[in-house]
Amino acid sequence: MAVTKITDLNLKNKRVLIRADLNVPIKDGQITSYARINASLPTIITVLKQGAASVMVTSHLGRPTEGQYDENLSLYRVVNYLQQKISIPVRLIKDYLNGISFTEKQLLVLENVRFNKGETKNDETLAKQYAALCDIFIMDAFGTAHRAHASTYGIAKYAPLVCAGLLLYNELEVLSKALNQPVRPMVAIVGGSKVSTKLMLLNKLSKISDHLIVGGGIANTFLAAQGYNVGQSLLEPNLINKAKQLLKYKNILLPTDVRVSQELDNAATLKHIREVGNNEKIFDIGDESANRFAKILQQAKTILWNGPVGAFELTHFRQGTKILANAIVSSNAFSIAGGGDTLAAIDYFNLNDKISYLSTGGGAFLSFIEGKTLPAVAMLIERNKNN
């Protein structure tokens, strides 16, 4: 891969700035998942061990009004957690755009980049201010690599030296291999609510997968394209013709039985797809379909999963996603999962350590699989030519 990685550079006595993805979920003032921080730790610890003169890490958190400080979205909670994981002092720096005074043996966390006006617009002046803070910029935030922001793309343009962190490099390696050199059979699962949000993903995976399992609300449009009544289920009528075109790929697999109800909080009824009533809504795939898909998954050598196949948050619409998840982890396949809802389902079923690779990207994960250019990665590649 044409990206300089962290191990290619000598960091000793250098000022190093790491752009991590520390955008953790917060509820009632508490971090509810430390997964993104933990995923960033190997890069941070590697830099600390390399003898850098100063080590800085920054990230965005949430969506504050740009240019305004919001204590609820401050990185101070992240600092508190990092201090538990790192033996040297960890300091939060709020005012850093005009330079930083620092002492050795400290990790400096630069406050939420979205508090800086111009961050999401990739303001050139702001990008140059970031770049002036460091000798080496390490891009390690795969989750934001699809955004051309000042702290991901702009700084990479102006920093003296740039490279990919361990997390970003690993994400690119794993996903590239799965897409370009998969061990076959390759099975993909695409769930979620709307076809419109995953049209490019479906199009790409239908071409490279041996089997493409479609579930969730997305499946409703495909079922309607086959002539089935989906009642009051979530449906995108304007995409039925597109679904018909995709169904020409004979590797797309749809449920033949489903769990329905008139509302999410009502009891579920298991029905063949031909039996869905006019007032019913589909909220999960049925057991027959789930078990049929499970057998295919257990024969796979590569599995790519994005999106639950039902409303797994509710007990009566959980079974389909649970059966597929268990089939994935009991297979001998190299399994990759990405997307917030997918990772939430995996976490709910306590299968985090049984999936081969959990991608930290949501939008970036989808964009990469779809074949889109990730601006921050493209800039790293461009700079690599000149490093």
UniProtKB/Swiss-Prot annotation:
UniProt KW Nucleotide-binding keyword: yes
The enzyme's E.C. designation: 2.7.2.3
InterPro entries tied to this protein: Phosphoglycerate_kinase, Phosphoglycerate_kinase_CS, Phosphoglycerate_kinase_N, Phosphoglycerate_kinase_sf
Catalysis performed (reactions): (2R)-3-phosphoglycerate + ATP = (2R)-3-phospho-glyceroyl phosphate + ADP
Pathway(s) where this gene product acts: Carbohydrate degradation; glycolysis; pyruvate from D-glyceraldehyde 3-phosphate: step 2/5
Cell location: Cytoplasm
PROSITE patterns to which the protein is assigned, alphabetical: PGLYCERATE_KINASE (PS00111)
GO terms, molecular function: ADP binding; ATP binding; phosphoglycerate kinase activity
Residues noted as binding ATP in the record, renumbered to the chain: K198, E313, G339, G340, D341, T342
Keywords: ATP-binding, Cytoplasm, Glycolysis, Kinase, Nucleotide-binding, Transferase
One Pfam family of this chain: PGK
Binding site for substrate: D21, L22, N23, R36, H60, L61, G62, R63, R114, R147
GO annotation, biological process: gluconeogenesis; glycolytic process
GO cellular component, one term: cytosol
UniProt-listed HAMAP family: Phosphoglyc_kinase
Family listed: Belongs to the phosphoglycerate kinase family.
Subunit-level organization: Monomer.
Name of the protein: Phosphoglycerate kinase
Species name: Baumannia cicadellinicola subsp. Homalodisca coagulata
Organism classification: Bacteria, Pseudomonadati, Pseudomonadota, Gammaproteobacteria, Candidatus Palibaumannia
